[in-house]
Amino acid sequence: MPNSNVRIPPTVPSKIIDVVDQALRARLLGGSTFNSGFDSLDSVLNLQFRLHYHVIGSNGPAKPVCDVLLKESQNLEKNMSMMEELNDYPEITKLVEKILFNCLGILFFHRGQFQESQRCLLHSLKIHNNTASQKTALMEQYDRYLIVENLYYRGLVSQDINIMQNVFYKELLAHVDTIPPESNGLLFEYISLIVAKLRFNQIQDLAENFKTTVENPFILFLYMIKKFQSPLKKHIDNDDLYLKFGQNVLLKAKFPTASETNDEALEHFNVFLQYYFKFTHIKKIKVNPSWYNFIISSMEKTFQSIEVSKTAMFLFQNLSDNSNDEIKKKTFKRESILNFVNFVKYNDKYYQLHDNSHRDIISFIDAYSFILQNSSKTDSIENVFDYDNTVSTFATSLNSFYKEYNLPLMSQSESLDWLENSTRCVYPGNISKVLTNAWSTLYEIRKYQLDFLVSNNLTSYLCNAMMLSTKEKDNADVEEQEEGEEEKALRELQFKYSYTLAQQRHIETAIKTLESLILSKNPNYYKAWHLLALCRSVQEDKEMSYKIVCSVLEAMNESLQNNTLLLNDRWQFIHLKLTQLALIEEIFGTLEALETLPEVFELYATLFPDSQPELNSMGPKYSQTKEYLLQMVWIFAANMYMRTKDNDEDAKAAIKEASNVESKFKNLNCNIANGYLSIIKDEPGVALKEFETVLYYDENNLDALVGFAELIFPEELGVEETNLERYYTLSLDKKPGKRAKLTFVNDTDRSAAYARLKFLLECAILESIEAYYSPEVWWYLSLIYEKYQDDEYKNSLLKCIKYQELNPIRSLRYCNY
């Protein structure tokens, strides 16, 4: 007879399984908030999170932190036997114990107590869950991660590179031999850490060391991780080899019957290809066109494969990027989008069939980011892919994901003060990269949309990205340290955040952010200095702004002499020089500024010599060419001439020079300059024609709108007002205030002009960032509202005053290169 005293563990209720799984799923992502239904499990998961907070992406916790965490760990160990809630759940007990002893092993390692560390790690390794029937798939994933984490620290504890590598090569594939889901971030993290410690040159070496075949997709994946960690491009020689392996897998695969699933080997190989094609896309490396046939065959041999559709999305975009045939380029891009649509459709189906649970939420977010970065409104496909709707769905999904996993999220109001409200979020590396990329993608798509700027959505996107990108240089020896890719990415996010604050006219906060976050650690970040100077220029005393500009110009000149000035910094150099001229004009007068003008042309010739064609353009658009930049300089000169007496001909000549720089491209700035010159010359009809031409192509063009408004509401100053203006601005060399004005046929004609101007200005403040923050626009709106006897004129006048007081010397866009 069976022993009646043997206690049979009860079946775990499904509700308990669900909440435990959700807690483990959140922890694998790097989450910090858990409600598993077991206080002991929540406590040990929280302990593990706090330990990882000081371990992941850093050199480990400081000794005081180690001491605190070690004491808590030891208290948990003592209380294990008294945790009655675990009595009926042996699988949870073993999980808690395993996590705890891993934590103890890590803490002892970082305290330098290597023998004690090894004892705890070996104890954790011996803990086996014999109640396999009660283990869920999530528990098995979590157990696999714990074993790999344990393996990594057992390798480190040996303190011998050869022993460590032998341990890794001997054991890793015994525990994990398939590429894990991207959402299993902690397993990803430790696989990456192990790979970073391995020494090998070729894929064949790696396979031999692991005693497996080189065709193994997991081996190829490990090799790809190593390539991600290295700036070298040796992997490019393996493209044909990968294709050969893929074709071998295809030969063995067949389309599944109704009772079968897709071929595992083919799907696994496609998972590897996702990383490979993403890597080649990032590095702008062309792949073999024969991959096209491979991916088509993969589709033919699978049924609604999530993995194949995502692989195809990456591949077709790569083929599009590298095609010289415009028709093929568009066709491949369309194929990439269609495969994204399939990827989403298959994921949604999985979600519905699995109790509203995503197959791999991080992979899902990653696919959205990729397709939105590589497409635009013009790529929309009727009834299939609507770009704007896809962006909205992505934003909603991202916020829902954060809510579901209780991840820290900075709100719109909090995002206005990063220095006060920021927190450091530490997630596994692959999770951080995907989420940072997601928030950055939303910012890049919506950064020109006024409603998202005013609602503080843009600052929120950037803050949530910055919370994930916390890798910075130490303050010590700042200049000697070489900046890595992560530091550069964070610095760029910080600049965009400061720039967005300045756009919103939160000038003081922008100044604090620039000085505290960026310039204290990156003294040679020129565009941040330029933005700081523009922010400082709103102050009545322009001396601080002027000093900043002069100092940075000296530093940039030194970099130029040392031949270390990058192309975008050369553009910055020119615009910084123009900002200097604007400040000189404001402080000392226009004539003084005109004396400095020749220096700009000399600088341009030095920065962009004809003998260096690589400096001709920053990108494919005409507005990114050095010719366009030269036109901007001539237009700047023309505007300056217009502000002086008897220099109409010089202004006209400067505009002509700008037009002659490039005859193939029509620069609307030349029309705008001609319009203002025509106002000065009392030629309102010519001026109107020029402004109307610009508004036809760009209905929200600020300069054209203001010029049009000037024609309808000309400013005429009396003698006393003119003398007073000259006294306060030190502009004795400026023209009289009389301006040209339009002649109306009758009152109906005049009313129609007012109505048109009202319509244009009201549309502009709803759509254009520059127009919304322009004091001139609000001034002319107040005049119109006053004529219409609309009380809104008071509010418009207040906004005019507010934005005039916060108006920089030049547009902020001139520092953003």
Swiss-Prot record:
Listed name of the protein: Cargo-transport protein YPP1
Subcellular localization, as worded in the UniProt entry: Cytoplasmic granule; Cell membrane
Membrane topology: Peripheral membrane protein
Alphabetized SUPFAM superfamilies for the sequence: TPR-like (SSF48452)
UniProtKB keywords: Cell membrane, Endocytosis, Membrane
Recorded superkingdom: Eukaryota
Record organism: Saccharomyces cerevisiae (strain ATCC 204508 / S288c)
InterPro entries in UniProt: Endocytosis_PI4K-reg_protein, TPR-like_helical_dom_sf
Gene3D superfamilies: Tetratricopeptide repeat domain
BP GO annotations: protein localization to plasma membrane; protein targeting to vacuole; receptor-mediated endocytosis
Designated gene of the protein: YPP1
The UniProt record lists the keyword Cell membrane: yes
Role of this protein: Involved in endocytosis.
Self-association state and partner proteins as the record states: Interacts with ribosomes.
Any one Gene Ontology cellular component term annotated for this protein: actin cortical patch
Family in the record: Belongs to the YPP1 family.
Additional record remark: Present with 1640 molecules/cell in log phase SD medium.
